[in-house]
């Protein structure tokens, strides 16, 4: 019920920001912001806390910030391209940040 109310409030107050929607992700305090071609996971309680990267009123990262959380997000900014976000394990290779996402894309190549 809370999740539906938050979506309605966001869409009613910011009708031209309809490209972002809040989705429940299992726990009442865990939400995801969905942008075109991008999903950013909000940390637990971000919707009702003073998280430094999150603007809960606008339902997205604060102005000038790139991300809220993720393996390629530090201090509200994407990590530089080529930063290792997952070290090699077994016959797998390192995975690297792209510089344009907070996600850690899987390296499809093997040694």
Curated annotation (Swiss-Prot):
Gene3D superfamilies, sorted: Disintegrin domain
User: What is the annotated tissue distribution of the protein whose record heads this document?
Assistant: Expressed by the venom gland.
One Pfam family here: Disintegrin
Q: Which residues form the Disintegrin domain?
A: 26-111
Q: Where in the cell is it found?
A: Secreted
Question: Under the cellular component aspect of Gene Ontology, which terms does the record hold?
Answer: extracellular region
Q: Which UniProt keywords apply?
A: Cell adhesion impairing toxin, Disulfide bond, Hemostasis impairing toxin, Platelet aggregation inhibiting toxin, Secreted, Signal, Toxin
InterPro entries membership: Disintegrin_CS, Disintegrin_dom, Disintegrin_dom_sf
Prosegment residue ranges? 21-46, 110-111
Q: What is its main location?
A: secreted
Q: What does this protein do?
A: Poor inhibitor of platelet aggregation. The disintegrin inhibits the adhesion of cells expressing the RGD-dependent integrin alpha-5/beta-1 (ITGA5/ITGB1) to immobilized fibronectin. Inhibition on alpha-IIb/beta-3 (ITGA2B/ITGB3) is low.
Q: What is this protein's name?
A: Disintegrin Eo1 subunit 1
This chain's source organism reads Echis ocellatus (Ocellated saw-scaled viper)
